[in-house]
Each structure stands twice: as C-alpha cells, then as structure tokens.
Amino acid sequence: MDVSSDGNIFLAGHTLSGTQNWDTYTIKLNSNGDLIWEQKVGNPRGFNPQYIHDEAWGIKATNDGGCVTIAGTGDEYNYSQCNGNDCSDTWNAYLIKFDNIGNIDFETTFSSLDLYNYAYDWAGEDIDLTDDGGAVIAIDNGQFGFLKIDGIQTNLIGDINFDSMIDILDVVILVNVVLGLEQNNVSDINQDNMVNILDIVQLINIILNFDI
C-alpha cells in the first residue's frame, strides 16, 4: 500500500477473480476509500496465461497521480514454453507503471539473463522511488538483492501540484501551505526540513530561472 501526497490510496496484490490465473491487481482509492480505478494485468511475456502466475508485492505512488507496481511472473506447473532463452518456468521481476487514470504507461520484466549468461528465478518483492526519478527494487533471487532502475517519473522540484509544470499555481499552493491553509509533503523546496518564506522565494527564483 502507498498513499500519494494528495491523499489517494494505492493497493497492490494478485487475484483469481475474472482472470485465467493469478494476475496482478492494482487499485486506486480516494481518501474516503471510494474506488477511482482498478486494473488486473499479467502475462507480460506472452506465454499461455492459464499457467502463468503474476504476483504483486509492492507499490509506490508516483508524482503524476499514477503508481508503479512490482511483481513476479512465471509458472509453477509442468507446462514450460520458451521464447529463445526466456522460459516461462524461469521467473522474472515484473514492473507496471500506471498513469493517473489507470492506463498502463509501460510494463517490463527483469531477469538474471539481463546481467548473466544463465537463468535463475527473480521476483520483485518491493519498490521504492529515488530522488533522481528512478527506483530501487527488492529482488527475491533465492537469496536477496536490489535492482536500481531509471525513468519511473519526472522529478521536478517545485511542481507541487504534479501537473508537470512549475508556475504560479505552485506558488499559490506553497503560500497556502506556509499559511497553514493546505498540507503538501513536497513543499520543502530548499530541503531544510521546514516550509516557510524561504521556500516561496526559492520557488519564485526557479520559475524566473534564477535558481535551478
């Protein structure tokens, strides 16, 4: 589970409801618990979906109003199918990026074949976002490891309303935060663990290209 800066709730898991086998199940709720959207997604490598388990274990809200879900994908049956060196019974970490309204921005898999000349099982167990717009994924590979990736979200310091722009609307929100009229957890522009007039000054300088 994760909660976005504007109070929306994101949940991830896996389900057999309305699917051919276990598929990832991602839900976005508003702060009252009302459903905004839900998505069931699986079988990214295109094998027979009747034999593929897609099991989601982690999720993070992204600054565009969407989220990123991390899972594992593979089969646990006598069935086995291969596309080149990529075989269904070798599990992969499975990442899905959703936008604000639940559409898939992109999905991809990661495996030991990306790094080595031999295959063994990988599954994504959890995910956290990094300040450079990427993410760190916790990998179950029979032991435990971490995978650093890029390109999960655009990191715009000062984009307080998450509209992919830095403008006067962000200044208005920041002023309201300083006055105690609103709450926002990305308002500390200068990263001094306080939100005050200095953050407003720096945000205005960013807009005027005096500070980058």
Label each residue range with its predicted role.
Residues 151-212:
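Cellulosome-associated attachment modules in secreted, modular CAZymes
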Residues 1-155:
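A sequence-level/structural motif corresponding to short, flexible coil/turn segments enriched
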